[in-house]
């Protein structure tokens, strides 16, 4: 759009320049000379803009897309010139605001995105479900046509030859043509570039392919028009190739990812992979580079040589120290992996990454980025991926990355963990992790089925106890656990979802304790912030019983323990108090232990102390031969049988996560923003819209 050129309040004339195709020249002249209204061109990029809004979370369904279209200039022009925008009279009869027309436009754009593999579109409800490919398209400014091309042609077996061909098919180059006077030079370039080009010189894709390889090879061009086209191609090359890298990673194509990443780095560095990595350092003498490349000495083995040996290798003794410094400034990482199976199909890996190179701000900048890939035994499938960013201030520290990865059945002999530099060619380390001596856990028992029982009335607790509660019947989970908790003295492990009423189940065990002779009970909560609310709630619930929270001093805690009926504490507090259990009879006389949120046994901070406290409680009971009951309350567990065995629970009620008193509807919206403040901003609006809707 050409606005008013010059300074209208001072000048009488102004100049503006429009660069366009010759076929469009008369159109722009008519706009200026006849002062026609500027028409909207939004329809041509509607699908791509809709995709960007969906990825942002602004638009989640067709109705929101209709509302969004109402804010556009396209909508204004459709109201003013309906015939020009194919708005038939049928739309305007009972719909002055063109809601149906906008719905049809949104529907058409959604169908285009769905065909390109960027969207799942439910035509009945109008719901849009985005994916990683849509995010890549939006972040790299790729059209849905280009993404459809990549979706169609990109395979797990694609080689560098095929990747260059796919690159040349991009919609960004649709206006590129092969001129008659360019054919001879393109033919010469096809013979000079290292990667073969299948297409003939008359096809635009061959021209695009040849120009990209010419750019990497740093070859000179003769034609001015061809040089201009190469600038256009190379300006988009890095962006498109980086998008191809992410597409391959998301799809799990291990080998194709390596090819695409190498092509992207070759384009940015303007050197081929067969050249020495020394070319990536600025200001290195060309003679030094040529001598090193003629030797064909493996780059990785240079780290084993001393400066004088490097000088002898290239035939320039005085350059040995310079070469040694450059070799040890080249990004290199050491890896160590520790792994253990969580289940028969899930492996937890703790990866220790140690930088082993000299950091130079002029060369490495403020940070270096690496791709972390876990590949299968054949190196064909990416099982896990992430990005590791090494900051300058942590360049000498060890870094630990923890992640989980799927274990396939049958168990493969090994996996491969790779770290590939995002910017440096040949900066890669690969670590095999062998499963030869890996011992898998037993298969887990199925969850306890939720029975369709008649709800148990609270009157079974007695009139006095029932009057303390605001409800008169138990839910299904409480009803099924009632017999084990209230009518027996057996230890019980109860696993149920959040909101299932597990605290009431703990209170059933307390009522059982006091109805059968009394005794002291201890409730262990994982976090200190949970203690005081529980104490206040139980003081109101059991006014005749003394409920206390432990303090920070041992002497005070001993006095509280002596006078308390119920003690509420964290694992750390009870650990300190119970260590000298042989000298403390009040610790020995505990008749009931309630371990809440027992699933946090696997937590890195709470878990070890929690496990020690539970094990010591059982040890004390075994040594003193006092009857002690243990109640474990937890979220649904896969290995509930193992936890019950550790706790000494003779009855295990481990319900599935879906066994909820109140059904829960789950909506998953992924976010892939590594920067935490940016992630919070990106999640704010979708979270607000979800709260307002549900």
Locations of regions flagged by a protein language model:
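Conserved pre-motif I regulatory segment
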Residues: 448-495
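Conserved interdomain linker/interface between the two RecA-like ATPase lobes of SF2 helicase motors
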Residues: 21-24, 615, 629-694
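Walker A/P-loop NTP-binding motif
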Residues: 483-488, 503-517, 615-620
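Conserved segment of the helicase C-terminal RecA-like domain
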Residues: 2-32
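Conserved Walker A/P-loop ATP-binding site and its immediately adjacent core
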Residues: 503-504, 519-540, 575, 635-640
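C-terminal helical accessory/scaffold domains
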Residues: 53-54, 93-94, 98-102, 107-288, ...
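Conserved SF1/SF2 helicase motif Ia
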Residues: 511-533, 620-627
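SF2 helicase catalytic motif II
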Residues: 571-575, 582-624
């Amino acid at each position: 759009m050409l606005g008013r050129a010059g300074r209208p309040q001072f000048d009488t004339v102004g100049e503006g320049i429009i660069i366009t195709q010759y076929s469009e020249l008369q159109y722009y002249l008519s706009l200026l000379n006849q002062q026609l209204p500027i028409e909207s061109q939004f329809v041509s990029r509607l699908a791509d803009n809709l995709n960007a809004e969906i990825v942002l979370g602004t638009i989640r369904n067709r109705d929101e897309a209709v509302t969004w279209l109402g804010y556009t200039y396209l909508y204004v022009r459709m109201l003013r010139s309906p015939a020009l925008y194919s708005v038939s009279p049928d739309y305007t009869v009972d719909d002055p605001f063109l809601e149906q027309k906008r719905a049809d436009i949104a529907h058409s754009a959604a169908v285009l995105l769905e065909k390109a593999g960027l969207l799942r579109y439910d035509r009945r409800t109008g719901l849009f479900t985005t994916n990683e490919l849509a995010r890549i398209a939006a972040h790299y400014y790729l059209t849905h046509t280009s993404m459809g091309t990549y979706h169609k042609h990109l395979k797990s077996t694609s080689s560098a030859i095929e990747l260059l061909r796919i690159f040349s098919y991009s919609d960004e180059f649709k206006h590129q043509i092969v001129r008659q006077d360019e054919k001879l030079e393109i033919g010469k370039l096809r013979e000079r570039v290292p990667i073969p080009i299948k297409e003939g010189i008359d096809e635009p894709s061959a021209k695009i392919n040849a120009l990209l390889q010419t750019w990497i090879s740093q070859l000179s061009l003769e034609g001015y028009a061809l040089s201009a086209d190469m600038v256009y191609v190379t300006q988009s090359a890095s962006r498109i190739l980086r998008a191809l890298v992410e597409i391959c990673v998301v799809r799990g194509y291990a080998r194709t990812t390596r090819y695409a990443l190498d092509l992207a780095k070759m384009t940015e560095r303007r050197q081929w992979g067969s050249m020495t990595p020394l070319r990536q350092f600025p200001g290195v003498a060309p003679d030094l580079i040529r001598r090193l490349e003629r030797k064909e000495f493996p780059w990785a083995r240079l780290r084993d040589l001393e400066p004088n040996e490097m000088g002898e290798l290239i035939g320039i003794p005085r350059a040995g120290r310079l070469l040694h410094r450059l070799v040890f400034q080249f990004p290199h990482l050491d890896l160590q992996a520790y792994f253990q199976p969580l289940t028969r199909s899930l492996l937890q890996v703790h990866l220790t990454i140690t930088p082993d190179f000299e950091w130079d701000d002029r060369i490495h900048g403020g940070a270096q980025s690496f791709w972390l890939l876990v590949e299968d035994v054949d190196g064909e499938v990416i099982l896990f991926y992430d990005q590791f960013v090494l900051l300058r201030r942590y360049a000498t520290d060890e870094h630990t990355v923890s992640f989980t990865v799927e274990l396939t059945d049958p168990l493969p002999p090994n996996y491969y963990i790779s770290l590939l530099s995002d910017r440096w060619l040949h900066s890669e380390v690969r670590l095999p992790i062998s499963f030869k001596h890996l011992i898998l856990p037993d298969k887990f028992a199925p969850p306890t089925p939720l029975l369709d029982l008649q709800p148990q009335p609270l009157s079974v607790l007695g009139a006095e106890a029932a009057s303390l509660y605001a409800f008169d019947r138990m839910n299904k989970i409480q009803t099924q656990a009632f017999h084990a908790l209230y009518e027996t003295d057996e230890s019980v492990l109860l696993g149920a979802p959040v909101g299932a009423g597990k605290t009431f189940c703990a209170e059933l065990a307390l009522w059982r304790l006091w109805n059968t002779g009394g005794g002291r009970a201890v409730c262990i909560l994982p976090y200190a912030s949970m203690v005081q609310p529980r104490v206040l709630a139980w003081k109101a619930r059991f006014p005749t019983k003394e409920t206390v929270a432990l303090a920070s001093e041992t002497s005070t805690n001993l006095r509280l323990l002596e006078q308390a009926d119920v003690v509420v504490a964290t694992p750390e507090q009870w650990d300190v108090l119970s260590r000298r259990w042989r000298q403390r009879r009040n610790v020995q006389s505990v008749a009931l232990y309630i371990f809440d949120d027992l699933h946090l046994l696997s937590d890195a901070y709470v878990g070890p102390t929690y496990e020690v406290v539970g094990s010591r409680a059982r040890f004390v009971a075994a040594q003193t031969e006092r009857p002690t009951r243990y109640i474990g309350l937890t979220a649904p567990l896969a290995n509930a049988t193992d936890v019950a065995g550790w706790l000494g629970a003779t009855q295990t009620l481990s319900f599935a996560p879906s066994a909820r008193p109140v059904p829960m509807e789950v909506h998953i919206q992924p976010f892939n923003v590594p920067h935490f403040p940016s992630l919070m901003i990106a999640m704010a609006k979708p979270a607000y819209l979800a709260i307002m809707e549900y």
